[in-house]
């Protein structure tokens, strides 16, 4: 993923990207000050990680879905396919916000039910925890998120524990 606030750097990265590996990924847009990154992705036939927040973190799933709708409409207005927006509900720190984890998992399920792709930075979940606990927390969260339909995850490539859960699939009803 091209992860910088420098638009010229993103455009330069896209211009040399080997598309035989799939579309480049722009990380990230939101429904406020970074919404123009949706336009940038659309203009370059790229995928964009669409953060479900505005000026601040969404307070609940209604607000997350409102931001999701704004980003989806913006992308479609610029010719993007809905599958080229990967929605990030923003995994929150579990320390002190345990109740928010279930909301994020429910939001992933909502995306999945709508046929939308989802992603997220899973290590946010364990931020501030002892180093030896973080892989366990992140592994548990990725397993739960995948069961809700998580499409992809932004994980620490040096921590292979989350990868061991890639065989899980959402339960079909």
What are these regions (language model features)?
Residues 32-92:
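Conserved anion-binding
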Residues 22, 34-35, 98-106, 113-165:
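Active-site-adjacent loop and "lid" segments of alpha/beta metabolic enzymes
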Residues 28-30, 57-68, 93-105, 132-135:
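Active-site glycine- and acidic-residue-rich loops that bind
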Residues 166-173:
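Conserved small/polar residues in nucleotide/adenosyl-binding loops
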């Amino acid at each position: 993923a091209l992860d910088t606030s420098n638009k010229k750097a993103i455009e330069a990265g896209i211009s040399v990207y080997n598309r035989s590996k799939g579309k480049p990924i722009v990380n990230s847009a939101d429904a406020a000050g970074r919404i123009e990154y949706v336009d940038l992705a659309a203009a370059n036939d790229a995928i964009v990680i669409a953060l479900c927040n505005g000026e601040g973190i969404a307070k609940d799933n209604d607000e997350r879905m409102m931001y999701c709708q704004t980003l989806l409409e913006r992308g479609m207005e610029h010719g993007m396919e809905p599958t080229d927006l990967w929605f990030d509900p923003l995994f929150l720190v579990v320390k002190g916000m345990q109740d928010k984890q279930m909301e994020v998992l429910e939001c992933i399920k909502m995306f999945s039910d709508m046929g939308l792709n989802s992603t997220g930075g899973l290590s946010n979940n364990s931020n501030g925890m002892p180093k030896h606990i973080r892989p366990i927390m992140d592994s548990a969260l990725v397993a739960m998120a995948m069961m809700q339909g998580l499409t992809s995850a932004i994980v620490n490539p040096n921590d292979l524990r989350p990868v061991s859960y890639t065989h899980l699939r959402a339960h079909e009803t």
